From Swiss-Prot:
Protein name: Isoleucine--tRNA ligase
Domain of life: Bacteria
InterPro entries reported in the protein's UniProt record: aa-tRNA-synth_I_CS (IPR001412), aa-tRNA-synth_Ia (IPR002300), Anticodon_Ile_BEm (IPR033708), Ile-tRNA-ligase (IPR002301), Ile-tRNA-ligase_type1 (IPR023585), Ile-tRNA_ligase (IPR050081), M/V/L/I-tRNA-synth_anticd-bd (IPR013155), Rossmann-like_a/b/a_fold (IPR014729)
Comment on bound cofactor: Binds 1 zinc ion per subunit.
Protein function: Catalyzes the attachment of isoleucine to tRNA(Ile). As IleRS can inadvertently accommodate and process structurally similar amino acids such as valine, to avoid such errors it has two additional distinct tRNA(Ile)-dependent editing activities. One activity is designated as 'pretransfer' editing and involves the hydrolysis of activated Val-AMP. The other activity is designated 'posttransfer' editing and involves deacylation of mischarged Val-tRNA(Ile).
Keywords: Aminoacyl-tRNA synthetase, ATP-binding, Cytoplasm, Ligase, Metal-binding, Nucleotide-binding, Protein biosynthesis, Zinc
GO biological process: isoleucyl-tRNA aminoacylation
Required cofactor names: Zn(2+)
PANTHER family registered for this protein in UniProt: ISOLEUCINE--TRNA LIGASE, MITOCHONDRIAL, SOLEUCYL-TRNA SYNTHETASE
Length: 944
């Protein structure tokens, strides 16, 4: 027997079967860097319509975690897919570089400013630390395969950016949004600074819950309000609180104007409570016997005065809409210096905003003899003892509740009234304009709109001042005596002068500045404001300080912001406030949020649990493309589960896609698209169908990319590779591809289809599996640009027309029939027919309502190649098909497959069984078809 292996067109490619991504990817990255791939893309896209995804800056502190990876990969997928969609989509990564966490790290290593070195030296060390953190994170982000201007990122500590942050504040001042006030703000006693809303986390805390009686100053007046002048015993108004330490700052008691308040007789005294809460309060304080003497509306009690239990003054009853019946007594202890609602109502009534607590959380001297110098969280017991001594404590118990804590220290925080600078939400209509702008933004998922609308509608004024060392200075001057801001025009001119200096020397220029250099003779009357800006102002102003300033953005506003769902109250909020305050419009057109990562059991990632997944470990073991594929295949709108098992599944999916690509490349061996391409109208019908499959898949994949629906992209890609190609087309074409004449139309038609499919597939993969797409690109035949990322989606796809005889609907029926035939072939393995080519299939049918069988008959001899059997016979059953046999419906056609052993001998070249093996003397051991393909004109294929 001759060896016919040399006569076959066996697949061959240098594209490896195994990805070995962890080993190969670093080399590809080095090439990308050496070639300046990002610069090549920018040059290729110059002049195209822009799409700007503005990077929300991660904090320059610590190594990147899996959440960082999700965020950067999602951004990169969008930027690359937009590039392939014909956009110029520059990506400038950024970092948030000022603020407390960096200060704390530097303090831990070197000590606090003023102890061993000056504030200026401390800032220099903070800048140095932030720079090292940026370098570390940048390497990991690049390793993820994220393309961007990594050589020129934006840093909020860049001198020019610092200067522009000051200019942004100047514009906000010019537009009338800044004001100064002693308002209660979130205050961390460990940070000794105000905190932004986004820096507050909530944890369970056990606190004392107390009911306190404030005795009426004019007993008769109160009794008269209830129409009960003869009531015996003293009358008190009862408040309930879980923060006894705030009682020294009490300046009023708030009631709801429309609630009914009851005068209740207990144990020789009368107390006033909300009528609906009487029963629960009586149970709580253990009053078994009580009598409701009368009721009045809260409005009737307004401005009646009650004696503070131990502070030696009396306070008014006032009316407020913030009073509820959810808990307590219906009478709210009101300390304007310790709560935003209290402050607002206090302003309405002209109450003192008392602030008896220092920045360290201890009571200031002169507060109360037994409280002076005591930390507020240690003062609750002292206050409770005071109330007992004064006979004002009705009840005390322990209560667990959610309490605000510092995001950095995880310790409880307080509301503390301090002189601060605020961006007003209402003075110049910022709240209403922001709500209007929100409606013009596309929120993805759409529930993001309601979430941020609620936050904007209910948020207090934004406290933008901080008492920190490492931050952008507010750059303001105030009068030494009145503390009034320098007149507006001079303030703006002074800020611009400061900004110019900061642009040259950084923020230290402000602290080195002698006011005389700017204010001249007036310098003696004014002093510099020592405060720095909230770091959320730094990042929130980047639509101006970065997007408006970078030349590659060419004056275009950002199209998209993309961050985790916690940023509705963080970066999305601060960016919206600043942009609307400066320009009257939102800084973004689309806002996309992704969920947080959890483990395979849905638990939050935690080092203590030991369920964290390190992106560095994943890249070093599996490769970045596996991590990228996991991100893309996960629905980012909810929690994103990741574990070793989940990543293993992503690796399995990757292998299926890679194997498909390798099959395409291996079978394109020897194909030159410039000379070997077959025209569509001359191609085998099945090949045109396959290209049409790719066309349909591309339409759906591009639609999913456009909708940022990346898990749908992956699902559609997998279906194309595994089902449409792997389970059908690629199996069928192996015979033709391997056995036909090398340069025959039959084979070149197949290669033409594979070429079109590969050109499309590599581009679908590129935004997600970027390294693998780049690797595939290098093995594709034909002239092309150096990188897949510089081009656009493949536009060479075509398909079958609907009015053709063998259209897509026909091939859908064929695929269905083939699935059923394959099941019967599988069943026959038990009867000794081990492979499909050992089989002869007789397809019986009783009717052909939709014409599928008629069309199958028209395929003639080629029908067997579709079913990958040696013989295939179609037989009409006039009397119908026996119901006891296996039967099924293809469209409206009832058919049955009967499998028997194929007739004839096995051809050693094509492995088909035929009755003409050995009929040609020169080739005595192969079939007639193979003889034709070796020595004759070659077989002709029209359909399959």
């Amino acid at each position: 027997m001759s060896d016919y292996k040399s006569t076959l067109n066996l697949p061959e490619t240098g594209f490896p079967m195994r990805g070995d991504l962890a080993k190969r990817e670093p080399g590809m990255l080095a090439r990308w860097t050496d070639d300046d791939l990002y610069g090549i893309i920018r040059a290729a896209k110059k002049g195209k319509k822009t799409f700007i995804l503005h990077d929300g800056p991660p904090y320059a502190n610590g190594s990147i975690h899996i959440g960082h990876s999700v965020n950067k990969i999602l951004k990169d997928i969008i930027v690359k897919s937009k590039g392939l969609s014909g956009f110029d989509s520059p990506y400038v990564p950024g970092w948030d570089c000022h603020g407390l966490p960096i200060e704390l790290k530097v303090e831990q290593e070197f000590g606090k400013p003023g102890e061993k070195f000056t504030a200026a030296e401390f800032r220099a060390k903070c800048r140095e630390y932030a720079a090292t953190q940026v370098d570390g994170q940048r390497k990991d982000f690049i390793r993820l395969g994220v393309l961007g201007d990594w050589s020129h990122p934006y840093l909020t500590m860049d001198f020019k950016t610092e200067a522009n942050i000051i200019r942004a504040l100047g514009r906000i001042i010019k537009n009338g949004h800044l004001h100064k006030g002693a308002k209660p703000v979130h205050w961390c006693v460990d940070c000794r600074s105000a905190l932004a809303e986004a820096e507050v986390e909530y944890y369970d805390k056990t606190s004392p819950s107390i009911d306190v009686a404030f005795r009426a100053v004019d007993q008769d007046a109160v009794k008269a309000k209830f129409g009960l002048p003869g009531v015996s015993g003293p009358v008190s108004l009862v408040i309930w609180t879980t923060t006894p330490w705030t009682l020294p700052a009490n300046r009023a008691i708030s009631l709801a104007p429309d609630f009914d308040y009851a005068l209740v007789q207990i144990d020789g005294q009368a107390v006033i409570l909300a009528k609906d809460l009487v029963e629960s309060v009586m149970q709580r304080i253990g009053a078994a016997e009580y009598t409701i003497l009368g009721t009045v509306k809260g409005a009737e009690l307004e401005l009646l005065r009650f004696t503070h239990p131990f502070m030696g003054f009396d306070v008014p009853a006032i009316l407020g809409d913030h009073v509820t019946l959810d808990a307590g007594t219906g009478a709210v202890h009101t300390a304007p210096g310790h709560g935003p609602d209290d402050y607002v109502i206090g302003q309405k009534y002209g109450l003192e905003t008392a602030n008896p607590v220092g920045p360290d959380g201890a009571y200031l001297p002169g507060t109360y003899p037994t409280l002076d110098g005591v930390n507020v969280f240690k003062a609750n017991d002292i206050v409770i003892e005071l109330l007992k001594e004064k006979g004002a404590l009705l009840h005390v118990e322990k209560m667990q509740h959610s309490y605000p804590c510092c995001w950095r220290h995880k310790t409880p925080i307080i509301f503390r009234a301090t002189p601060q600078w605020f961006v007003s939400m209402d003075k110049e209509g910022l709240r209403q304009q922001s709500l209007k702008e929100i409606k013009g933004v596309q929120w993805i998922p759409d529930w993001g709109q309601a979430r941020i609308e609620s936050m904007v509608a209910n948020r207090p004024d934004w406290c933008i001042s901080r008492q920190r060392t490492w931050g952008v200075p507010m750059s303001l001057f105030v009068h030494k005596e009145t503390q009034e801001l320098l007149p507006i025009e001079r303030t703006l001119a002074a800020m611009e002068e400061v900004a110019k200096r900061v642009e040259v020397d950084g923020i230290q220029a402000w602290w080195d500045l002698d006011p005389k250099e700017i204010l001249g003779e007036d310098a003696d009357q004014y002093e510099k404001v020592p405060d720095t800006l909230d770091v959320w102002f730094d990042s929130g102003s980047t639509s101006y300080s970065v997007v408006d300033a970078r030349p590659e953005f060419a004056g275009h506003a950002a199209d998209m912001y993309l961050e985790g769902s916690d940023q509705h109250r963080g970066w999305f909020m601060s960016s919206l406030m600043i942009s609307v305050a400066m320009k009257g419009k939102a800084p973004y057109r689309q806002v996309l949020t992704h969920g947080f990562t959890v483990d395979g059991q849905g638990r939050k990632m935690s080092k203590s649990i030991g369920n964290t997944v390190s992106p560095q470990d994943v890249m070093n073991k599996l490769g970045a493309d596996i991590l990228r594929l996991w991100v893309a295949s996960t629905d980012y709108t909810g929690e994103m589960a990741v574990s070793d098992e989940i990543l293993k599944r992503a690796a399995d999916s990757y292998r299926r896609i890679r194997n498909t690509a390798r099959f395409l490349l291996a079978n394109l061996n020897g194909f030159n698209p410039a000379t070997d391409m077959v025209k569509p109208e001359e191609m085998v019908v099945l090949d045109r169908w396959a290209v049409g499959c790719a066309k349909t898949a591309q339409q759906e994949i591009l639609k999913a990319y456009e909708a940022y629906d990346f898990h749908e992209v992956v699902q559609r890609l997998m279906r194309f590779c595994s089902v449409e190609m792997g389970s059908f087309y690629l199996d069928i074409i192996k015979d033709r591809q391997y056995t036909a004449k090398a340069d025959s139309v039959a084979r070149r038609s197949c290669q033409t289809a594979l070429y079109h499919i590969a050109e499309a597939l590599v581009r679908w993969m590129a935004p997600i599996m970027s390294f693998t797409a780049d690797e595939i690109w290098g093995y594709l035949p034909g002239e092309r640009e150096k990188y897949v990322f510089t081009g656009e989606w493949y536009d060479g796809l075509f398909g079958l027309e609907e009015n053709e005889e063998f259209n897509d609907a026909f091939w859908d029926d064929v695929r269905y029939i083939k699935d059923q035939v394959n099941k019967e072939l599988e069943n026959q393995k038990a009867n000794g027919i081990k492979s499909n080519l050992e089989a002869k299939v007789t397809l019986k049918y009783a009717d052909d309502a939709n014409g599928t069988i008629k069309k199958l008959k028209l395929l003639g001899e080629e029908v067997r190649f579709i079913f990958i059997t040696s013989q295939f016979v179609i037989s009409e059953q006039a009397g119908g098909i026996d119901d006891e046999n296996i039967q099924y419906n293809a469209g409206n056609t009832t058919v049955q497959a009967v499998v028997t052993r194929a007739e004839g001998d096995k051809c050693p070249r094509c492995w088909h069984y035929t009755t003409d093996v050995g009929k040609v003397a020169e080739h005595a051991d192969i079939c007639g078809r193979c003889v034709s393909n070796i020595a004759g004109n070659g077989e002709q294929r029209k359909f399959a």
